[in-house]
């Protein structure tokens, strides 16, 4: 492992350090991300760098008690393991995550040609109401904070301005959501929220 690092140029060492920090901070790396300026999906430079050093990085994280996995069909590289950063989410963030996963699975089952799925804030809120998952409508501040958190973890991309959120506000659901939640777990959590009669809605949950 030390020999591998010594053979890298200073620029490559700097890139490798950056990739390690990024993975520790956000868990996921996406092969393609949406570029709002160009209104299209573009290749992620960090993903390419990670692929180039994948074997070394897998050994590096294994020593630290984590596993670095690559899901080639969906273009996602991600960390798993007890020592990997868990997604600490508020109740609203957890609910949004569950509903995003439901929407993602439904659209993918309709023979979608893309691993990235589009939805709207309005659809999210409609689903939340139909499942009766919250007693009160979340404030705009809570919604903005929640969407920003999910964006940080590379779960979604927010296509419209955060300060102008409306029902028509568009979101992209990235394939990384399938690495966070599996079908049975989604239904289990949804049922627990439906049955919940009281409790602190801002209590963090680890996913």
Model-derived regions, located:
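Eukaryotic partner-binding/assembly regions in large regulatory complexes
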Residues: 1-82
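Short alpha-helical segments that sit at the start of domains
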Residues: 10-15, 81-117
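Short acidic, hydrophobic short linear motifs in intrinsically disordered regions
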Residues: 34-44, 111-129
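Short amphipathic alpha-helical interaction segments
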Residues: 49-57, 135-152
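A short, conserved structural fragment
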Residues: 62-70, 147, 151-163
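Accessory beta->alpha helical hairpin/"wing" motif in late/C-terminal subdomains of nucleic-acid enzymes
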Residues: 76-81, 157-184
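Short acidic, glycine/proline-enriched loop segments that cap or flank alpha-helices
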Residues: 108-116, 134-138, 159
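Short, amphipathic alpha-helical interaction segments positioned at domain boundaries
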Residues: 170-207
